A protein has these predicted regions:
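Radical SAM enzyme [4Fe-4S]-AdoMet core and its adjacent flexible, acidic
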Residues: 1-104
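Flexible mid-to-C-terminal extensions adjoining Fe-S/redox cofactors in radical SAM and related proteins
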Residues: 77-168
């Protein structure tokens, strides 16, 4: 699997390849020796351009993240608080906690109203496209986990949903 870089510092923004890179030319698959067995390797490349097709593998594959402290988050991107840079713009991501397995069962958290509503919203991807918005330069929402449609958290400019950054 090959993935793009998620810049955490301003100096890393110049190291991204998406939206400006020439297509990578590598074989889609190859034979790999495995003792007496012949294995077949498959290359899984990320998308290199921002586009309208967005989907969340965590929601589609009914996955979640349980932190070291028992807190349940819907995905890696929302599992902790951190800054990152997308297309040169700083974004502060706040951890999105949907429950704690020390207080409730995983089944209760998964079927809770907030989590069900969040998954439905992500499944239909009802978020604006912040990256290519004409107001993006003067919008305060895009600097945080929010968007102008009132979503908090917002997956509007999630690089994982774009398949620019891939999960293992």
């Amino acid at each position: 699997m090959i993935s793009n870089l998620l810049p955490y510092r301003p100096e890393q923004t110049g190291q991204t390849l998406y939206d400006r890179a020439e297509p990578v030319s590598i074989p889609a698959s190859w034979a790999v020796g495995g003792g007496s067995w012949l294995l077949w390797g498959i290359t899984k490349l990320p998308r290199m351009k921002w586009g309208a097709q967005r989907r969340c593998r965590f929601v589609d594959e009914e996955s979640l993240v349980i932190g070291w402290d028992g807190v349940v988050s819907p995905c890696y991107a929302l599992a902790h608080t951190y800054p990152y840079y997308t297309y040169g713009r700083r974004k502060e991501v706040e951890r999105y906690a949907l429950g704690d397995v020390r207080d409730k069962s995983l089944s209760e958290i998964w079927s809770g109203e907030e989590y069900v509503r969040f998954r439905a919203k992500v499944r239909h991807f009802r978020f604006p496209s912040c990256v290519d918005c004409a107001l993006e330069g003067g919008c305060d929402f895009a600097a945080h986990n929010q968007d102008c449609w009132g979503n908090d958290p917002s997956c509007a400019d999630c690089l994982w949903a774009q398949n620019i950054i891939q999960c293992p």
